[in-house]
A protein has these predicted regions:
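Predominantly flavin-linked oxidoreductase catalytic cores and closely associated redox partners
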Residues: 52, 56-213, 250
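FAD/FMN-dependent oxidoreductases across multiple families
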Residues: 158-165, 174, 187-269, 283-294, ...
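Helix-loop-beta segment of a Rossmann-like dinucleotide-binding subdomain
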Residues: 30-51, 182-185
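Alpha-helix N-cap/helix-initiation motif
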Residues: 43, 47, 51, 85, ...
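Short coil/turn segments at secondary-structure boundaries
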Residues: 7-8, 143-145, 213-215, 305-312
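N-terminal FAD cofactor-binding segment of flavoenzymes
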Residues: 1-28, 303
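C-terminal auxiliary extensions adjacent to catalytic cores
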Residues: 314-373
Length: 373
């Protein structure tokens, strides 16, 4: 473990014991609810966190290990001697280093200035907006059917992103919930609503409104996230420099779960291991730092990025976010409607709704989904 005893000492919010996935239309929700007791081994469990609490704690751990932080300073440019990166420039100040690790987020201007990160493809990015809404621990436990320090993670497809590529999310914290949505950057230009309006409509959905009733808005934020998968991973190593985290495109949206922080941490660990080895060799050239790529290939980072490389193309299918949520809701509505008319066999009911999408489309999408996952 990078930080032994992390789950015991870190300011985590709740241990996730309930995972939900919902297909939403404007007026309905079809939900898959999975509940389990998390393992007794803390490092095998899943936790919710709030970055404004976790990040300062992480900074303290790094400082105790010998790192020095200079917060609130923007890096304006990279310092180079020939082809080698030798430091960073912040205003009039220059900080020199044997190796610079770029972790400047999904829109890595520093990586782009070196020619390592190519020009942006809008389909490789999504815009996320989030509200942190304060509730009492008792309200959270009652509304999400959890107890003690248990938590819930909930993903939504369909109406939250107005039928476009994206979806909603909800995570329970100790005394608040994190509620938001993401929408593909390439789709925003064609959207009928603005992203803030999508979030407001999401909050008013019949499945969401009771969960946040009486809550107090504590925080509002927006963030751009990578969605391109393996196809957007840039050149990771050059003379005196490496790229990690979102800047390297290390994020996986699998539909049923979203992974970003774990891949960012694992890539940073691989970079740190590489720097330590390079220092022992007194060699910070690109060929020496190429160990970083080998470390990534041996870790979960590149293995999972490679395994799920077809997911981004799957997520570009508009039927996943419009027609399929509607089809599932219509089938469930018909199954549970008693109107005095003879009931159809369920197979005929399903087939009738499936034909609206097209059996060929269903077959193609099913095969594509199976191969992607």
């Amino acid at each position: 473990a990078i930080i032994p005893g992390f789950a015991v000492s870190a300011p985590v919010e709740r241990k996730v014991t309930r995972e939900k996935i919902s297909f939403l239309t404007e007026e309905s929700a079809v939900t898959l609810d999975f509940h389990r007791e998390q393992p007794d081994v803390p490092q095998h469990a899943s936790y919710t966190v709030l970055r404004n609490r976790l990040d300062p704690w992480l900074m303290e751990q790094a400082e105790q290990a010998g790192a020095q932080f200079i917060p609130g300073v923007r890096v304006d440019a990279l310092v180079r001697e020939g082809n080698k990166v030798t430091g960073v420039q912040a205003g009039d100040d220059i900080l020199e280093a044997n190796v610079v690790i770029l972790a400047d987020g999904v829109n890595s201007m520093l990586g782009r200035s070196l020619g390592m990160v190519p020009a942006s493809d809008p389909h490789h990015y999504a815009v996320g907006v989030k509200e942190v809404i304060g509730l009492t621990p008792e309200q959270i436990n009652d509304r999400f059917n959890i107890t003690g320090e248990e938590g819930a993670a909930w993903l939504f497809a369909g109406s939250p992103s107005d039928g476009l590529m994206g979806g909603g999310f909800l995570y329970t914290n100790k005394d608040s919930i994190s509620l938001g949505l993401v929408c593909g950057l390439g789709d925003i230009a064609h959207a009928q609503k603005s992203v803030p309006q999508m979030l407001e409509d999401f909050k008013q959905h019949p499945a969401i409104r009771p969960l946040i009733s009486g809550g107090k808005l504590l925080e509002y934020s927006a963030h751009m996230v990578p969605e391109g998968g393996l196809a957007m991973v840039p050149q990771l190593v050059n003379e005196g420099v490496m790229i990690v985290g979102d800047a390297a495109g290390f994020c996986l949206n699998l539909g049923f779960t979203v992974r970003g922080m774990d891949l960012a941490i694992a890539s940073a660990q691989a970079a740190a291991t590489t720097v330590i080895a390079a220092k022992e060799r007194a060699d910070f050239s690109a060929s020496s730092l190429a160990q970083y790529k080998r470390e990534l290939e041996q870790s979960c980072v590149m293995r999972d990025m490679q395994h799920f490389r077809k997911i981004p193309a799957l997520m570009e299918n508009p039927r996943l976010f419009s027609q399929y949520p509607r089809m599932v809701a219509d089938i469930m509505n018909e199954m549970f409607t008693i109107d005095g008319k003879p009931n159809q066999p369920v197979r005929k009911m399903i087939m009738g709704h499936a034909k609206k999408i097209g059996l060929i489309n269903l077959l193609k999408d099913g095969i594509k989904g199976a191969t992607a996952l």
